[in-house]
Amino acid sequence: MHEFNKGVTLIQLSSALAYSHALMNQVVNPGDHVIDATVGNGHDTVYLAKLVGTTGHVDGFDIQPAAIKATTSALDKAALSHQVTLWQTGHEHLADKIATDQPIKCAVFNLGYLPGGDKQIITKPTTTLTAVKAIQERLVTNGLIILLVYAGHPGGATEAQAVLDYATSLDQHQFQVLQYQFINQVHVPPYLLAIQKR
């Protein structure tokens, strides 16, 4: 029988959002080029801009003017606007905005609707997967695509299944895929998918 090691610190399980930030911390370095595929209210955009520093760059996408406005304000407040380009367009147009030979270290998606916004305007399976595939073509070795997947709103379960099916189908010799999810919560919390290029 093994004695419990009293020097081991037990961790508290983090939310999917907190875990996404932990993953970003591990993979993103100053000077990297990263993508916020759904800028929303700008929280992840600001977080990524801090990680890439003054020598890196963030490209952020959102179709909603309110999201671009909120993110611009958050970046201005944090004095990080100079290292971010915001595109008021859907992330499915990423391939038109980011050069094919531009290496991407990390990309983050918060699927669903804009918090505090119109719940009828949601991300869709076809556009999300178009963006994911465009990023995969530019992703560096050990680079990461992080998707926070929300299934509780109308249309969310369909998108969640499409994204999960796609991620599951990826060749394990080219990508490794992690699913991080709490399975006993009744309010359908988001889960995280992380796709890492080998």
Predicted region positions:
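Conserved beta-strand signature within the Rossmann-like core of class I S-adenosyl-L-methionine
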Residues: T38, R138-V149
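Conserved SAM-binding loop of SAM-dependent methyltransferases across substrates and taxa
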Residues: N41-T55
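Mobile active-site "lid"/loop adjacent to the S-adenosyl-L-methionine
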Residues: G112-T130
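Class I S-adenosyl-L-methionine
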Residues: K97, G156-R198
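Conserved SAM-binding motif I beta-strand of class I
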Residues: H57-D62
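S-adenosyl-L-methionine
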Residues: M1-H33, V46, K50, K69-D101
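A short glycine-rich, Lys/Arg-flanked "PGG" loop and its adjoining helix->strand segment in the class I
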Residues: T127-T141
